[in-house]
């Protein structure tokens, strides 16, 4: 009996030792699983970023059928020059502003007097505007369809507006079919060294003055977008303790954070979210209504349409 008891005791000790080893091995394997999950998430993020870059480089940059042929006789600095040279059809044209090192493609809106260079369009939510700094710098989106969503690129927007005095016009449409607009004098975007800081002058229009924070002083001090640098989720230049671009899912000239965010998520009208991250124009529909379509476009302030 004594021998059997000793055998049982020794066996229980070995079993406890084996159990302890199993627990330690389990802890080690759990740590490896967490490490692998972290690495997988990192790789997934890299894949998403590479796909976004690939979209910028290869997709939707226009083909020969979507670009209006001007015959190669001269280079144009913007859509105003194209219009006054007799090309009255809205569509995609190649242009080269004075300081731009290369030609680029942009949509020319020949309505409202003609000569408008479109640098942003929202129409159906088909493009993600929750992008990193280089995406917004170089431009992205659909450069084929006449109503395709795109961002022309902060570099190109700087080259355009640095040529002289430009007027900004913003056309807005809600899901009830109502259309309004906002227009700003002396619109400009600084260069890369100033993080593409935005400036604008006097407002006119029917949508309300959201770019300067609206009319209410309790909103204006933290929501005025004038003089703000551009921010993206990976380049935070706002005045907020957190990261506006990350919270609002967009690149924009955020303050603390916004009274206008036309690069927000595409909802269909009224929406509910943790933050007011829709396509927002506060002075028209407030922060919790996302607009159906937006067009942002510029034209020289001294533009005189050639009717010939």
Which role fits each region the language model picked out?
Residues 1-109, 113-114, 305-308:
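Assembly "stalks" and propeptides
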Residues 130, 137, 237, 241-286:
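Glycine-anchored, exposed beta-strand/edge motif detector
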Residues 216-247:
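Extended, non-catalytic structural segments that build the interaction scaffolds
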């Amino acid at each position: 009996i004594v021998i059997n008891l000793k055998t049982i005791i020794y066996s229980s000790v070995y079993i406890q030792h084996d159990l302890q080893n199993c627990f330690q091995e389990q802890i080690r394997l759990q740590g490896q699983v967490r490490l692998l999950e972290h690495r997988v998430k990192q790789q997934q993020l890299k894949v998403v970023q590479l796909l976004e870059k690939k979209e910028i480089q290869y997709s939707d940059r226009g083909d020969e059928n979507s670009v209006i042929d001007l015959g190669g006789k001269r280079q144009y600095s913007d859509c105003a020059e194209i219009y006054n040279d007799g090309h009255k059809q809205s569509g995609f044209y190649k242009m080269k502003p004075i300081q731009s090192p290369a030609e680029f493609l942009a949509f020319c809106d020949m309505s409202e007097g003609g000569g408008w260079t479109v640098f942003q369009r929202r129409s159906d939510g088909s493009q993600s505007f929750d992008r990193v700094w280089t995406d917004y710098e170089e431009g992205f989106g659909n450069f084929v369809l006449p109503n395709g969503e795109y961002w022309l690129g902060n570099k190109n927007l700087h080259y355009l507006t640095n040529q002289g005095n430009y007027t900004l016009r913003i056309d807005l449409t809600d899901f009830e079919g109502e259309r309004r607009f906002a227009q700003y004098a002396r619109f400009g975007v600084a260069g890369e060294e100033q993080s593409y800081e935005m400036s604008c002058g006097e407002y006119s229009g029917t949508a309300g003055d959201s770019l300067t924070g609206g009319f209410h002083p309790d909103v204006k001090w933290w929501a005025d977008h004038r003089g703000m640098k551009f921010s993206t989720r990976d380049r935070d230049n706002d005045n907020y303790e957190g990261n506006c671009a990350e919270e609002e899912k967009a690149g924009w000239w955020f303050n603390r954070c916004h009274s206008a965010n036309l690069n927000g998520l595409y909802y269909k009208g009224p929406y509910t979210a943790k933050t007011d991250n829709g396509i927002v124009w506060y002075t028209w529909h407030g922060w919790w209504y996302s607009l159906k379509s937006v067009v942002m476009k510029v034209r020289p302030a001294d533009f005189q349409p050639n009717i010939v």
